[in-house]
From Swiss-Prot:
Biological role stated in the UniProt entry: Functions as a sodium-dependent neutral amino acid transporter. Exhibits preference for the branched-chain amino acids, particularly leucine, valine and isoleucine and methionine. Can also transport low-affinity substrates such as alanine, phenylalanine, glutamine and pipecolic acid. Mediates the saturable, pH-sensitive and electrogenic cotransport of proline and sodium ions with a stoichiometry of 1:1. May have a role as transporter for neurotransmitter precursors into neurons. In contrast to other members of the neurotransmitter transporter family, does not appear to be chloride-dependent.
Extracellular side: 1-70, 640-730
Pfam assignment, any one: SNF
Gene designation per UniProt: SLC6A15
UniProt keyword annotations, A-Z: Amino-acid transport, Glycoprotein, Ion transport, Membrane, Neurotransmitter transport, Phosphoprotein, Sodium, Sodium transport, Symport, Transmembrane, Transmembrane helix, Transport
Biological process per Gene Ontology, one example term: neurotransmitter transport
Alphabetical list of PROSITE patterns matching this protein: NA_NEUROTRAN_SYMP_1, NA_NEUROTRAN_SYMP_2, NA_NEUROTRAN_SYMP_3
Name the record gives this protein: Sodium-dependent neutral amino acid transporter B(0)AT2
Principal location class: membrane
UniProt record similarity statement: Belongs to the sodium:neurotransmitter symporter (SNF) (TC 2.A.22) family. SLC6A15 subfamily.
Stretch list, region Disordered: 1-24
Subcellular location: Membrane
Membrane-side (Cytoplasmic) residue stretches: 170-223, 356-458
Length: 730
């Protein structure tokens, strides 16, 4: 306290002493006095407030301009490319409509409770992932750092997919679409179709050769693909400009990036339902295969999809919710966003299989036409007798039903010779059973289907613009999960950090736009997030339930929400979720161990994919991705457990935010100014800097030199005076 304030101090000693006695006698009344007391420092009136109710740090924190903007941000983050190209594949692969039941069960058991937990801690503590877990326990601060590392790994390759979508978007403004037909190759004597394209398909060729110009293995880098390099740069510029002011800039874009995909999906669904074969695709999709539903693999894949669909463990959920008001109903938000995510997945599944049903119908018609012509040739050659063909069937204009009848007759009559005829059954179910996911769905199967659409360039533009928006919505949350914790912890300027983060990511991301870049995308997708995020969320669950205390956390929720949350969450968080997450982690490790580490390489000579194992250095990279992602957890624990680094400056976010003022401005303590009472500081904490908004008490309290354990925080002095005072709430 400055010297010229000592007179004021003496004049107020009696009143202040009485306030201090009240403070020490009753925690609740102390909290009220703490929030309402007014002190005169340097001749100015200042009002002390609780850190939760609006400290200087909190007052400066940005906030969502509306609840709708916040909900759209969470929806945009959780609803991503996986909803469009992974959920439909899993639904088809794991029993069709029957897959929805285990998915819904696991959404209720794992998804909503853990999503609610992340929303709650972010909103209650109002910090990013690093600050939140430092608050719970400084030794567990590595959880937040691990989330940041995983977010960065994912951002590196996720934005590459946005770059691919930008490339296809830019190529969609032409008629016909460039992937509609195979290119012709001319030489001195004649013109012929490109062999690689002829052996595969026009859309497959365009993806692998024109877009990626892919190499034959991960070891053949092949140099940079300049087209994709420019698209990647454009993607990072878009992300940087949208995030440079945090939620103040991204919040405006969220309205478009979150809502536009729904407009496109609904338009696609309406258009697809008007096409031949779309109903066949939807019927095939939702025909339940109950026998598959009981397989353990189905439940494991459903749990994994629930886990990643909501963005658990990334830190983006926590970062977004940290900008909420403390009394926001985050329970409602958790349920609402979770079910919006689920219904988006179902909507995308309807669209995908309506379109694929149309595509299968087109391919099936071509198949029937070609095989009917083959049968007619056999009839002319005498290989097949005309007598076995029903008289009412005209093979020149045969229907699918009549063709299948002829096919079955020939198969019975020519049972021994039938394989040599090389006839195809041409059943639409066989085409629909060809499971496609990921880039194969978006850039090959879907693009092929759109070439048969009337006004195909328009639909192509809409589709890839939708993919860009879905990707950007998820990228906003991912980057927020990186930037917000670092800004909260190290107090750097958000604008500078965002630019550096995006620039560095673009430079590192150049490995993904080599000719072998697609293989690195596969590697990062398989190894950089799955296991690390599971470990992070398990530790989050343990930190809240067993370190902070589940009973205390439930009381915090009651105080924050204004009502007691259902005991259902108590049992889910404490018992069910940890066990299921641990089981999922073990199953994922076992599955990863049983699956040979490798990737599908495009072999130009064969014009097909071939599974290749990673080289030795590739295996080292795979292991390193997992290790580096989880390494912050043990490192931070060891550093803080054994005090290996002087953490007093707060550089490692050592300050936990207990009830009381967080002091930012240092003052000089003189004489019996050492008797100032700040509030309650955890005994695990390094000493904080003293600020000017502080309580005062009479001289005679323990001096700084007598603080417990040789520490000199005023919070320890208060602990000596009243050792039985209970820990404050979150």
């Amino acid at each position: 306290m400055p010297k010229n304030s000592k007179v004021v101090k003496r004049e107020l000693d009696d009143d202040v002493t009485e306030s201090v006695k009240d403070l020490l006698s009753n925690e609740d009344s102390a909290d009220d006095a703490f929030k309402t007391s007014e002190l005169i420092v340097d001749g100015q009136e200042e009002k002390d407030t609780d850190v939760e109710e609006g400290s200087e740090v909190e007052d400066e924190r940005p906030a969502w301009s509306s609840k709708l903007q916040y909900i759209l941000a969470q929806v945009g983050f959780s609803v991503g490319l996986g909803n469009v190209w992974r959920f439909p594949y899993l639904c088809q692969k794991n029993g069709g409509g029957a897959y929805l039941l285990p998915y819904l069960i696991l959404l209720m058991v794992i998804g909503i409770p853990l999503f609610f937990l992340e929303l709650s801690v972010g909103q209650r503590i109002r910090r990013g992932s690093i600050g939140v877990w430092n608050y719970i326990s400084p030794k567990l601060g590595g959880i937040g750092f691990a989330s940041c590392v995983v977010c960065y790994f994912v951002a590196l390759y996720y934005n590459v997919i946005i770059g691919w979508s930008l490339f296809y978007f830019s190529q969609s403004f032409q008629q016909p679409l460039p992937w509609d037909q195979c290119p012709l190759v001319k030489n001195a004597s004649h013109t012929f179709v490109e062999p690689e394209c002829e052996q595969s398909s026009a859309t497959t060729y365009y993806w692998y050769r024109e877009a990626l110009n892919i190499s034959s293995s991960i070891s053949e880098s092949g140099g940079l693909n300049w087209k994709m390099t420019i698209c990647l740069l454009a993607a990072w510029v878009m992300v940087c400009l949208a995030m440079i002011k945090g939620i103040q800039s991204s919040g405006k874009i969220i309205y478009f990036s979150s809502l536009f995909p729904y407009v496109v999906l609904i338009c696609f669904l309406i258009r697809a339902l008007l096409l031949n074969g779309s109903i066949d695709g939807i019927r095939h999709m939702f025909t339940p295969k109950l026998e598959i539903m009981l397989e353990p693999k189905v439940w494991r894949e459903a749990a994994t999809q629930v886990f990643f669909a909501l963005g658990l463990g990334f830190g983006g959920v926590i970062a977004f919710s940290s900008y909420n008001k403390r009394d926001n109903n985050c329970h409602f938000d958790a349920v609402l966003v979770s079910f919006i995510n689920f219904f988006t997945s179902v909507l995308a599944t309807l669209v995908v299989f309506a379109v694929l049903g149309f595509k299968a119908n087109v391919i099936n018609e071509k198949c029937i036409t070609q095989n009917s012509q083959t049968i007619m040739k056999f009839l002319k050659m005498g290989n097949i007798s005309q007598d076995i063909i029903p008289h009412h069937i005209n093979l020149s204009a045969v229907t699918a039903e009549d063709y299948h009848l002829v096919y079955d007759i020939i198969q019975k009559v020519k049972e021994e010779e039938f394989p040599a005829l090389h006839l195809n059954s041409c059943k639409i179910e066989e085409e629909l059973n060809k499971a496609v996911q990921g880039t194969g769905l978006a850039f090959i199967a879907f693009t092929e289907a759109m070439t048969h659409f009337p006004a195909s360039p328009f639909w192509s533009v809409m589709f890839f613009l939708m993919l860009v928006n879905l990707g950007l919505g998820s990228m906003f949350g991912t980057i927020e999960g990186i930037v917000t914790p670092i800004v909260d912890t190290f107090k750097v300027r958000k604008e500078i950090l965002t630019v550096i983060c995006c620039l560095l990511a673009f430079c590192i991301g150049l490995i993904f736009v080599q000719r072998s870049g697609n293989y690195f995308v596969t590697m990062f997708d398989d190894y950089s997030a799955t296991l690390p995020l599971l470990i992070v969320v398990i530790l989050e669950n343990i930190a809240v339930c067993f370190v902070y205390g589940i009973d205390k956390f439930m009381e915090d929720l009651k105080d924050m929400l204004g009502f007691a949350p259902s005991r259902y969450y108590y049992y889910m968080w404490k018992y069910v979720s940890p066990l299921m997450l641990l089981s999922l982690l073990i199953a994922s490790v076992v599955n990863m161990g049983l699956s040979p580490p490798g990737y599908n390489a495009w072999i130009e000579d064969k014009a097909s994919e071939e599974f290749l194992s990673y080289p030795t250095w590739g295996l080292v990279v795979c292991v390193s991705l997992v290790v580096f992602a989880v390494l912050p957890v043990p490192v931070v624990f060891i550093v803080r457990r054994f005090n290996l680094i002087d953490d007093s400056s707060g550089n490692l976010a050592s300050v936990t935010y207990k009830r009381g003022r967080v002091l930012n401005e240092p003052v000089n303590l003189e004489g019996d100014d050492t008797s100032l009472i700040h509030g309650k500081i955890s005994s695990e904490m390094p000493s904080p800097n003293f600020g000017k908004n502080i309580y005062r008490k009479q001289s005679g309290s323990p001096t700084l030199d007598t603080a417990p354990n040789g520490r000199y925080g005023i919070g320890y002095l208060m602990a000596d005076i009243m050792p039985d005072m209970p820990e404050s709430d979150l």
